[in-house]
């Protein structure tokens, strides 16, 4: 399980340090793909395989399912952690998420997310993230 948030910087070559707590769960190689809300999602190879199986079971005849599967898989890349604990974020994924310099790397249960610093600060400060709003949504979900 992944949790917590860490600030790091993307270097001139597009590399970023992955926090050691996250590296342990993700492994030396993992999948990085386009996420929702204009961030990136990172999955361990095992979790990616589980997600792939779930997506494969969805009805291929549904246009929205096909669009979602394309979005998720077309942007995916296998990345490898170097000896300094960094990964190279592919250019297309950096552009998608607007990653230029400062980033937040956050743990979200079964995945890790990589956010542009200003986007994360805006999103996490948004009313959708207020304690009251979250409590209401949790109650609606029976949590």
Swiss-Prot record:
Domain SpoVT-AbrB, first and last residues per copy: 5-47, 76-119
Single GO cellular component term: nucleoid
Coiled coil regions in record: none
Lineage top rank: taxon: Bacteria
Locations listed in the record: Cytoplasm, Nucleoid
Keywords: Cytoplasm, DNA-binding, Repeat, Transcription, Transcription regulation
InterPro entries: MraZ, MraZ_C, MraZ_dom, MraZ_N, MraZ_sf, SpoVT-AbrB_dom, SpoVT-AbrB_sf
Gene Ontology BP annotations: negative regulation of DNA-templated transcription initiation
CDD domains, alphabetized: MraZ_C, MraZ_N
Keyword DNA-binding: yes
A molecular function GO annotation: DNA-binding transcription factor activity
Cytoplasm as UniProt keyword: yes
Family: Belongs to the MraZ family.
Subunit comment: Forms oligomers.
NCBIfam families for this protein: division/cell wall cluster transcriptional repressor MraZ
Name of the protein in its database record: Transcriptional regulator MraZ
Species this chain originates from: Acetivibrio thermocellus (strain ATCC 27405 / DSM 1237 / JCM 9322 / NBRC 103400 / NCIMB 10682 / NRRL B-4536 / VPI 7372) (Clostridium thermocellum)
């Amino acid at each position: 399980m992944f949790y917590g948030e860490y600030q790091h910087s993307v270097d001139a070559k597009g590399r970023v340090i992955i926090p050691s707590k996250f590296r342990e769960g993700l492994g030396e190689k993992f999948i990085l793909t386009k996420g929702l809300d204009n961030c990136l999602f990172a999955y361990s190879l095992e979790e990616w395989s589980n997600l792939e199986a779930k997506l494969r079971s969805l009805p291929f005849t549904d246009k929205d399912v096909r669009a979602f599967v394309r979005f998720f898989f077309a942007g995916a890349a296998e990345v490898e952690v170097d000896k300094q604990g960094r990964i190279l974020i592919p250019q297309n994924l950096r552009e998608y998420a607007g990653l230029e310099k400062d980033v937040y790397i956050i743990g979200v249960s079964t995945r890790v997310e990589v956010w542009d610093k200003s986007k994360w600060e805006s999103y996490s400060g948004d009313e959708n993230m207020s304690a009251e709003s979250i409590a209401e949504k949790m109650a609606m979900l029976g949590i």
